[in-house]
Amino acid sequence: MFAHTALRQRCAKWLLATGLFLLLGACVEKPSTLERVKEDGVLRVITRNSPATYFQDRNGETGFEYELVQHFADDLGVKLQIETADNLDELYDALGKPSGPVLAAAGLVSSERRKTQVRYSHPYLEVTPQVIYRNGRPRPTGAKGLVGKKIMVLKGSSHADQLAELKKQYPALQYEESDAVEVVDLLRMVDEGQIDLTLVDSNELAMNQVYFPNVRVAFDLGETRDQRWAVAAGEDNSLLNEINEYLDKAQKNGTLQRLKDRYYGHVDVLGYVGAYTFAQHLQQRLPKYEKHFKSYAKVEQVDWRLLAAIGYQESMWQPEVTSKTGVRGLMMLTQRTAQAMGVSNRLDPRQSIQGGAKYFMKIKEELDDSIKEPDRTWFALAAYNVGGGHLEDARTLAKREKLNPNKWLDVKKMLPRLAQKQWYRQTKYGYARGGEPVHFVANIRRYYDILTWVTQPQLEGQVAEGNLHVPGVNKDKPADKSSPM
């Protein structure tokens, strides 16, 4: 009897202890997603490798999505850790893994098929889905014209969803979804005639058009849509709420607009002929002078590709060019500037590049200290073209209009006014062809973007061997030189 009583007491104590342990365990709340990120000190993000999202150059990681999410990580006070997915299915699946990324920032458009997997953030970029065809082939003018065409799109994309809906209306419509390609590959396949059509978003086309000057927009397929970030559907609201607050703030404080201007504000300046010509000169002319650009860029501590872009804008990498106004050489130096920079022969490409590099950095160093990068570079380019005095006049006009005189996005709006009497009569330095520096900067930014992309470490071997696909090179020249749009 006594033994049974003792046993019951021991069991009761054990049950009580177990119950207390379970009760205490239940009282310890699981940290939220946001708390985990802050405790770890790392924001793990998955994206796509493309010019419009994320890629690496000699200076490190870059891209629209990368910069936007880097600002978010900075706001959280944590480090950013990026991984890339080979395809959209892999990207979405990674969000559901316990040790995987907590955020997808990859130019995503909300998709019905993904709603059980993820939840989407507030929008940050408006894009238009576009049907792309090759110049010289019949142009489809509407959805019915897609029937009978060889079409390929990214597997699991919103474009695949659109085609699936159209197939209900046009049962004969056929298309292929591929997880072995990226947008760049699809555009190349259209450019080379491997497929008839593809669907891409307008921002992706804008970033890649110059590499594939044969591609054209047939028509917009549907209304504009919003790009968003995504988090796993199973996560709590903490991180998504923080993301939405950040994106709303970025919209209001100008962060988003500055990034849009940096990555998309200059992408349509080349046109078809410019894209084709630049593609040729990239392989035929640049190699002759690349060592000089690199050498003097190192001396002046400037990116050699920026110097090369300036040289292309000035002379198309032709060392013996002379303008009607007397500027000469690869970097198109005036006699006065050449003398000041120690250049004795403006037609010597080595001396011209040396003088141009030195002059550009001199201008940049003389700018007001309140002008920060990347705007400082764009201001220096404008001053290189139009002169520092006229640039200051434009900054003064910007102040009067309650715009930011230290932001290129604002000052470039004022420069064209220097050609209008009602405005230039109010300035210190008077009339200037103010529209020219705006185009000058836009062109150089575009050339620089292309040079940055094609000189990625993983592509340099192909460039050196002449195997890199650059549109218009190693192919028959397209017959039509009309505008791409």
Swiss-Prot record:
Q: What keyword terms does UniProt attach to this protein?
A: Cell outer membrane, Cell wall biogenesis/degradation, Lyase, Membrane, Signal
This enzyme catalyses: Exolytic cleavage of the (1->4)-beta-glycosidic linkage between N-acetylmuramic acid (MurNAc) and N-acetylglucosamine (GlcNAc) residues in peptidoglycan, from either the reducing or the non-reducing ends of the peptidoglycan chains, with concomitant formation of a 1,6-anhydrobond in the MurNAc residue
Domain of life, per UniProt, equals: Bacteria
Which portions of the chain have biased composition (kind: Basic and acidic residues)? 474-485
Residue ranges of region Disordered? 465-485
Location(s), subcellular: Cell outer membrane
SMART domains membership: PBPb
Q: Name the predominant localization.
A: membrane
Annotated GO biological processes are: cell wall macromolecule catabolic process; cell wall organization; peptidoglycan catabolic process
Q: Where is this region: LT domain?
A: 268-485
Q: Which InterPro entries does the protein's record reference?
A: Lysozyme-like_dom_sf (IPR023346), MltF (IPR023703), Solute-binding_3/MltF_N (IPR001638), Transglyc_AS (IPR000189), Transglycosylase_SLT_dom_1 (IPR008258)
* Catalytic residues as annotated in Swiss-Prot or TrEMBL: 314
Top-level EC class: lyase
Q: Which Pfam families match?
A: SBP_bac_3, SLT
**GO annotations of cellular component type:** cell outer membrane
Q: Which residues form the signal peptide?
A: 1-29
GO MF annotation list: peptidoglycan lytic transglycosylase activity
EC no. given is 4.2.2.n1
**What ranges does the record give for the region Non-LT domain, renumbered to this chain?**
30-267
Tell me how this protein sits in the membrane: Peripheral membrane protein
UniProt function note: Murein-degrading enzyme that degrades murein glycan strands and insoluble, high-molecular weight murein sacculi, with the concomitant formation of a 1,6-anhydromuramoyl product. Lytic transglycosylases (LTs) play an integral role in the metabolism of the peptidoglycan (PG) sacculus. Their lytic action creates space within the PG sacculus to allow for its expansion as well as for the insertion of various structures such as secretion systems and flagella.
The free-text domain remark for this protein reads: The N-terminal domain does not have lytic activity and probably modulates enzymatic activity. The C-terminal domain is the catalytic active domain.
Q: What is this protein called?
A: Membrane-bound lytic murein transglycosylase F
